[in-house]
Amino acid sequence: MIIVTGGAGFIGSAFVWKLNSEGIDDILIVDRLGTSEKWKNLVSLRFEDYLHKDIFFDMVCDDDLPFEAGRVEAIVHMGACSSTTERDADYLWENNFAYTRTLAEWALDHDIRFIYASSAATYGDGTQGFSDEHAKIPELRPINMYGYSKQVFDLWVLRHKLENQMAGIKFFNVFGPNEYHKGDMTSVIFKAFHQIRETGKVRLFKSYLPQYPDGGQMRDFVYVKDCVNAMWWLLQNPETNGVFNLGTGKARTWNDLINAVYAAMDRKPNIEYIEMPDGLRNQYQYFTEAEMTKLKKAGFRFDFSTLEDSVRDYVCNYLQKSDPHLGNLK
């Protein structure tokens, strides 16, 4: 059995889709569905069971799961509050750090593979670079509580010298199908697609640094299908451990991204640059780019999709379809 926490969420459900495509359906999904629409991510997926995250956590704390621990091959821990604007620091600490620590300890106690989600938000404003070398991690200074909640678990792993016993993934700007429930945290591609359909125009934030023109701010945009391929590789290579970046390794501009959406929709670009909210200016990243040397040295050999190809697949095969969710046949 493979346990996927956050298994109804964006990356988690995409990974379940990947597991299904590899013929695996002995999967326990752990999540909190609540009143959101993310249950729709599960409809086309095959899995053994679902547990609410709080019930699962209590079972782990009591070491009393409804199955033998020896049946569990891996825990892929994607569950977290991923909102970069969440202000409740206590909630983020408990939900993103303490919960993860408890699962990691349980996995280690039972010799279970543990793969967890860190984040590129740990890099803060990027002035410390984007190296995933372990010696560099303590130097990072996140600029929001979400990033810090991820950073503090990476530091816990290093402090307890566990980096050779589990794998952490610093996801960069992930986009793709099954993100639809995320509201304000959906990708700009998703938002742009709907803006174009409704108004023909896309709005982007202006730049406030002279070295970046409006729309010239850069991100490492990575397709969720590429991410789950990397996650599958880590699952298949349990001797590969540590904290790894996961991006394409090539930053592109917001203008590139929006132009790719227009091209996929066969429309002429029309971009309006708007003022950035004051509260966002002091925590805005102008440049992110994953340094991918470490994962490649570990043996990962995979060509990431180009931005244009990824956007076209997302728009044409999902966003423009009546059911845009990942399914076993796609």
Where are these regions (language model features)?
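N-terminal Rossmann NAD(P)H-binding glycine-rich loop of SDR-like oxidoreductase domains
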Residues: 3-22
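Glycine-rich phosphate-binding loop and adjoining beta1-alpha1-beta2 segment
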Residues: 29-57
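NAD(P)H-binding glycine-rich loop region in Rossmannoid oxidoreductase-like domains
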Residues: 44, 53-54, 59-95
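Catalytic helix-loop patch of NAD(P)-dependent Rossmann-fold dehydrogenases
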Residues: 94, 98-102, 109, 113, ...
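Glycine/proline-rich active-site loop of Rossmann-fold NAD(P)-dependent oxidoreductases
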Residues: 174-190, 198, 209, 213-217, ...
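C-terminal "lid/loop" region of Rossmann-like NAD(P)-dependent oxidoreductases
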Residues: 207-214, 243, 258, 266-287
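Conserved C-terminal active-site "lid" loop/helix of NAD(P)H-dependent oxidoreductases
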Residues: 224, 278-301
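Amphipathic terminal alpha-helices
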Residues: 305-330
